[in-house]
Amino acid sequence: MSKLFLTSYLAGTKNLVKEFLKDVPEKEITFVPTASNPEDYKGYVDEAKQAFLKLGFSINILDISKTEKQKIENILKDTKILYVSGGNTFYLLQELKRKKILDTIKDKISNGMLYIGESAGAIITSKNIEYNQIMDNKDIAPDLDNYEAMNITDFYILPHNNEFPFVESTKETIKIYGNKLNLLPISNSEAVFVNGKDFVVKNDDK
């Protein structure tokens, strides 16, 4: 059964990620920062690293864009917990498709691998990421010829709802796609716990 933790901002939901991982014997996380590659600001990546380290986990960095497909497959084969960072969603999907490992990740999740997705890493669990073009610049991914993603969740997560500097872009996304898609807006202090087809949104009470 698929188990996912989807958040806008991992550092803002540290108590919730602790709850998600509380009974997990595995202490190594495969950490994918790829979505942040084209971004100027990457502070959230370091914050996520520190959050996991403070919880007692070790981190194995895997940049999809800079790693050969076979090595990625070998690493994922032994991965029990996969974290995918925030950044540009279109670039992330482009690189996952370039290495042809989207289905590998889906299969691993369906077979029990825990998945933690932050912002872009959460968005790619939906069926299609085109709705995020208001928040993210899709021109950064010129080789991406379609926006079909993992199709694990029945909803379309909208991170950073009403959070600076995304107030206008989240409002505009809801205005344009709110009646077309099952949008699930979450703030930077909220996370979605997914268990199979069931899910619950929780707020980090700090």
Task: List PLM regions with ranges.
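Short, active-site-adjacent cap segments at secondary-structure transitions
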Residues: 90, 122-125, 191-193
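N-terminal beta1-alpha1 cap of cysteine-dependent amidohydrolase-like domains
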Residues: 1-81, 85
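Conserved anion/nucleotide-ligand pocket segment
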Residues: 151-195
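Short glycine-rich anion-binding loops that position phosphate/pyrophosphate groups of nucleotides
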Residues: 37, 87-90, 121, 162
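Patatin-like phospholipase A catalytic core
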Residues: 8-10, 190-191, 195-198, 202-206
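Class I SAM-dependent methyltransferase SAM-binding "motif I" and its flanking Rossmann-like core
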Residues: 42, 102, 106-163
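Glycine/threonine-rich flexible loop motifs
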Residues: 89-99
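Short, well-ordered alpha-helix to beta-strand connector turns
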Residues: 56, 79, 112, 153-154, ...
